[in-house]
Amino acid sequence: MLDAFSRVVVNSDAKAAYVGGSDLQALKSFIADGNKRLDSVNAIVSNASCMVSDAVSGMICENPGLISPGGNCYTNRRMAACLRDGEIILRYVSYALLAGDASVLEDRCLNGLKETYIALGVPTNSSIRAVSIMKAQAVAFITNTATERKMSFAAGDCTSLASEVASYFDRVGAAIS
């Protein structure tokens, strides 16, 4: 995993050059937006349990067969596994947002996820739906448009961070499909 700083150093080192120019400007921007980034991660992790349970509930409401005998969320053990997977995905999305880099998400969460779900018979369309619900929730929290819970954020526009987190959820959806 490379955070924004490590990535700049590795790129400059590969060119045998000092850190400067656009790389240095990108780091300045990353630091300037640091409080907004931390607030965005905090909004996700502070609401993680509710986000995951709401996403799984929404997925089940749209596909009640999941909790019928033989469904993938039938029995407490399977439901717990579904909730656990949602928590893991959300945790790695928050890591990626904190680092400003998707490599931790790709390497430690998405690598082999589709194959695992296929082997376990997990319906991918339902999983993708749960991920899309979490994506909408995360964007709402980051842009402070969640109707039930407002967060205090550092001054400034957070739409770029909302777009960034949305792209991480899109990667999860693409990895599962």
Swiss-Prot record:
It is a peripheral membrane protein. Belongs to the phycobiliprotein family. Keywords: Antenna complex, Bile pigment, Chloroplast, Chromophore, Electron transport, Membrane, Methylation, Photosynthesis, Phycobilisome, Plastid, Thylakoid, Transport. Heteromer of 6 alpha, 6 beta and one gamma chain. One of its GO terms (biological process) is photosynthesis. Phycourobilin binds at C50, C61. Pfam families: Phycobilisome. (2R,3E)-phycoerythrobilin 1 binds at C82. This is B-phycoerythrin beta chain. The modification N4-methylasparagine is found at N72. It is found in: Plastid, Chloroplast thylakoid membrane. PANTHER family: C-PHYCOCYANIN BETA SUBUNIT (PTHR34011:SF7), PHYCOBILISOME 32.1 KDA LINKER POLYPEPTIDE, PHYCOCYANIN-ASSOCIATED, ROD 2-RELATED (PTHR34011). (2R,3E)-phycoerythrobilin 2 binds at C158. The keyword Acetylation does not apply. The keyword Ribosomal protein does not apply. Contains two covalently linked phycoerythrobilin chromophores and one covalently linked phycourobilin chromophore. Light-harvesting photosynthetic bile pigment-protein from the phycobiliprotein complex.
